[in-house]
Amino acid sequence: MRAIYATDLSAASDAAIENETCLDCLERIGVEEIHLLTVVPSNVHAGMPGMDLEERRERGLEAYRSVMEEAGFRVETHIVRGTPYRRINGVAETVRADLAVVGSRGQSPLANRVIGSTARNLARTTVVPLLVNRVEREADEPEVIREHLFQRLLFATDFSENAERAFGAFNYLRHATEEATLVHVQSPKEELELDPQSELDKLADTLGQWDIDTQTVIRDGDPSEEILDVEESVKPTTTLIGSRGRSRLRRLMLGSVSEDVVAGAKGNVYLVPPARTAGYNLL
């Protein structure tokens, strides 16, 4: 597998990239090649006073490259200019990445970028499965909050085609997964022709065949609020969820349950986009 690893060269990015456990988790799910990417915002110029950005970025990426190569990955580096989330998506398509990784928070001293906003924009537009790696928000030397990325997964499903696609990610995530919680939230407006518990049990049976300890949860109420409440309760290392298959413009305007989860989850989030966006099959 091939991954895009987006960094703003902040202390938070240092924490995520230099964490051996996180890198081991990526290796366990099959990642062999990593494309390290940093984006120079369009409004930042090399000639600005006190900013030798190009050289500092190259040094930063080379340091990260050394860490990742030492961990056994093949590594390429990219420095590009533009809007971060757009360029991350563009490079992901160009190199035919299987997933992208981005830190959830991290103020960059180089570009004055808050990577959290990039993560949220990627949640709306990502063209490949996106791992939002949660790092401590307010610390001089931040740490990854839940470093065993895929050890305990929370999978949120509405039994849609896109949720089914997201569940397909277990085909490779299972190699690093020990426990899973499957949650479905029934909303007042929902009219399902199937039995939620029966459907969750079928999914649990599949995971059981892979020796993953699984529990199921059914809630009533607002999907975003209930999923985040379950996340707070069971404390998964990562929440797995599919994004809605709406038009890109509509997603940008309205937001979605998946965006709320990306914004509000305490742990990591793995977001799987619709097939027509991702351009390849997981199942």
Regions found by a protein language model. Give the residues of each.
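Small/aliphatic-rich secondary-structure junction motif
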Residues: 1-47, 149-194, 205-210
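Ordered, small/hydrophobic-rich secondary-structure cores
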Residues: 2, 21-103, 107
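Short secondary-structure boundary segments
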Residues: 38, 104-105, 134-135, 184, ...
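Short, surface-exposed alpha-helical segments at coil->helix boundaries
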Residues: 50, 54-62, 167, 193-204
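Structural beta-alpha unit
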Residues: 69-100, 138-140, 209-241, 246-249, ...
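Glycine-rich, Arg-bearing micro-motifs that act as flexible, cationic patches
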Residues: 103-121, 242-264, 279
